[in-house]
Structures are given as C-alpha cells and as structure tokens.
Amino acid sequence: MMLEHVLVLSAYLFSIGIYGLITSRNLVRALMCLELILNAVNLNFVTFSDFFDSRQLKGNIFSIFVIAIAAAEAAIGPAIVSAIYRNRKSTRINQSNLLNK
C-alpha cells in the first residue's frame, strides 16, 4: 500500500474517534472511541516505521507499548464503568459526578 492511503485511513479512524469522544454521552461509547484513536496512532507508528526506516523496529516497539496500554485501559475501563453504573444507575458522562459528593 502507498503511504498516502494508510495515512488517510489513519486520519479517518482518528477523526471518527475524536468525533465520538466529543459527541458521546455514554461512557462505554467514549471508551470505544478512545480505543479507535489508539489504533489510529498504532497504524501511524507502524506505517512510518516501515516507510522511513525498515531495518529498525522503533515504530513497532512503540505500537506494542500502546497496545499494552490499550489492553490495560480495556481491562480497567469497563470495571470503572460498572462501578459507576452500580452507584449511579447510569452510564451517562454528565451524570457521573462522583467527586462532587
């Protein structure tokens, strides 16, 4: 694939994720959009690593770190959402003001 095609795909994924984060009122949907943004960043890391310096694996190593962080977020995020739902009976972002009380 050409570099431009992959960058356009990554920009679309990133834009959809940002749009979802801005407009989402649901915590689960916001977590999914955050994962989409992280995947777009991973795609950029791997693409630039392959295109500019194919012998070194710096971009691939960065993407492995981002995948590890995303896995931790995917494990902890739903647990936090579940705890908020048990306390507030809602997963809406504007109703989760746990620090105010």
UniProtKB/Swiss-Prot annotation:
Pfam families to which the protein is assigned, alphabetical: Oxidored_q2
GO biological process, one term: ATP synthesis coupled electron transport
Keywords from the UniProt entry: Chloroplast, Membrane, NAD, NADP, Plastid, Plastoquinone, Quinone, Thylakoid, Translocase, Transmembrane, Transmembrane helix, Transport
GO cellular component, one term: chloroplast thylakoid membrane
Subcellular location: Plastid, Chloroplast thylakoid membrane
Keyword set includes Heme: no
Catalytic activity: a plastoquinone + NADH + (n+1) H(+)(in) = a plastoquinol + NAD(+) + n H(+)(out); a plastoquinone + NADPH + (n+1) H(+)(in) = a plastoquinol + NADP(+) + n H(+)(out)
Subcellular location, principal: plastid
Membrane topology of the entry: Multi-pass membrane protein
GO molecular function per UniProt: oxidoreductase activity, acting on NAD(P)H, quinone or similar compound as acceptor; quinone binding
EC number(s) recorded for this UniProt protein: 7.1.1.-
Transmembrane residue ranges: 2-22, 32-52, 61-81
Enzyme superclass (EC): translocase
Source domain of life: Eukaryota
Role this protein plays: NDH shuttles electrons from NAD(P)H:plastoquinone, via FMN and iron-sulfur (Fe-S) centers, to quinones in the photosynthetic chain and possibly in a chloroplast respiratory chain. The immediate electron acceptor for the enzyme in this species is believed to be plastoquinone. Couples the redox reaction to proton translocation, and thus conserves the redox energy in a proton gradient.
Entry's family note: Belongs to the complex I subunit 4L family.
Subunit field text: NDH is composed of at least 16 different subunits, 5 of which are encoded in the nucleus.
PANTHER family (alphabetical): NADH-UBIQUINONE OXIDOREDUCTASE CHAIN 4L, NADH-UBIQUINONE OXIDOREDUCTASE SUBUNIT ND4L
Name of the protein in question: NAD(P)H-quinone oxidoreductase subunit 4L, chloroplastic
Natural source organism: Fagopyrum esculentum subsp. ancestrale
Gene label: ndhE
